[in-house]
Regions:
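Active-site-proximal beta-alpha core segment in soluble small-molecule metabolic enzymes
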Residues: 1-70, 77, 94, 98-103, ...
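Broad hydrophobic/π-residue packing in well-ordered secondary structure
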Residues: 7, 11, 47-49, 68, ...
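Generic alpha-helical secondary structure signal
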Residues: 15, 83, 95, 162-165
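A broadly tuned preference for mixed-charge, low-complexity surface segments
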Residues: 33-47, 84-90, 166-176, 180
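Short glycine/threonine-rich loop-to-helix capping motif typified by GTGT followed
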Residues: 44-51, 79-91, 121-133
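Nucleotide-activated donor-binding/catalytic signature segment of Leloir-type glycosyltransferases, i.e.
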Residues: 106
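Charged (often Lys/Glu-rich) extended helix/loop segments that serve as interaction or gating elements
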Residues: 109-188
Length: 188
């Protein structure tokens, strides 16, 4: 499973290593000009406020050489009923307020970058696949389709939910609804 953040991730620099990184940058004659934080793609503004405070504290540790802050990790996309869209105006206001406080503190302009991630494209397409076979294996019924994780990797990589709809090919009334497993042509 892909791990894009936290202590065990291959990405970025864990916050406890920042003092060492700053010391190395100074030794090499480099000024740290940007700070990027991978925040995850949650819509919980209370959590984001905590993350913004953490970014601001780290920015102050870096100091006046900083000219850019970046909130990465993407914006949330609702896939299931009950999930909410991000309140974009509140999301921006939170990060812009952080940026302005840093500008006031440092006395120069701070650029704000926001990484939208899959937010821009997640709802831009539809995968259409065809049920090629039905099969019972023990107590489970499988619908075998002509698309697999090579076509739609997110559920396999992240264990994420992906909505599906069935489009009947006949006008015959459907049978009772039942839970089925969907399988593709690969050994997923």
């Amino acid at each position: 499973k892909t791990n894009t953040g936290g202590e065990g991730s291959k990405h970025g620099i864990w916050h406890e290593a920042i003092p060492d990184v700053l010391q190395r940058a100074e030794w090499a004659g480099l000024a740290v000009s940007g700070l990027h934080m991978h925040i995850g793609s949650g819509a919980d503004l209370n959590h984001l406020a905590t993350v913004a405070d953490s970014l601001e504290r780290t920015a102050r540790d870096i100091g006046r050489s900083l000219t850019m802050i970046s909130a990465g990790g993407g914006l949330p996309v609702p896939y299931q009923e009950g999930e909410h869209r991000a309140d974009m105006s509140e999301y921006f206001k939170l990060w812009d307020t952080t940026r302005k406080r840093l500008e006031d503190s440092f006395g120069h302009r701070i650029r704000l970058e926001i990484e939208p991630g899959r937010y821009l494209t997640a709802e831009a397409g539809i995968l259409v696949t065809e049920v090629r076979a039905m099969k019972r294996q023990g107590s489970k019924k499988y619908l075998l389709v002509d698309a697999g994780f090579h076509t739609l990797a997110r559920p396999v990589l992240y264990g994420s939910y992906h909505p599906m709809s069935l489009c009947p090919t006949s006008t015959t009334p459907p049978h009772e609804l039942e839970a089925v497993a969907i399988g593709g042509p690969l050994c997923e």
